[in-house]
């Protein structure tokens, strides 16, 4: 009805291309416009000024001969002041942008190894954006932003990369575990050494106390029982120690100690060996 009356509506973020007898006349801004169609005025088409997005998937090969799919996302929009160029000069904007993306990616990625391509995604995106901006500005389009969304290697390469990463992580974990075991063993050895040191001090003090006690016993027995010599007292002490030892060994049913020689007569031999050792020490 509006067109029949010569009225046309242009929506927000949109411009209309007005022609007069097939020739470009002017760009109509959003709003209501009078269009006298009876004198050859008409709308050739509408052009959106909204930001549009185009995702481009490009297959190429890296410097180390790995085939990858590079996914680029290009955001672009038509410029209102160059609406006539954007409308008339390009027949298929998306295909034109895609061609430039292919060209830049296939010129950049083959110069990089696969790992470098992952690290330099921003540099690739910047190269694509610069080339697009330079090429598309003459056609009335602005490149808002360009992103390299993903770099997808071949499935076999991806599996190999995952295995390499897994092996590296396992190696780090093994090293950490070995280091922890090493520290644990060192601490255990230090604790064992300290324990043995303290045990040695305890044994030394115990034996010192035994020696002091035996000395006091020998002196007291010799003073209180006339006619006894130190030898008689030592023999009696050794017999007492023998029976105490046998009692301690037999007190436990699970004892693994073996007393050799075990006969009572062996006490005499032990005493003789002690005396002989003392005599030899004095002679030396």
From Swiss-Prot:
Transmembrane segments: none
Gene3D superfamilies the UniProt entry points to: Band 7 domain (3.30.479.30)
Membrane topology: Lipid-anchor
Compartmental location: Cell membrane
Pfam families listed in its UniProt record: Band_7
Organism domain of life: Eukaryota
Name under which the protein is recorded: Hypersensitive-induced response protein 1
Organism: Oryza sativa subsp. japonica
Name of the gene encoding the protein in the UniProt record: HIR1
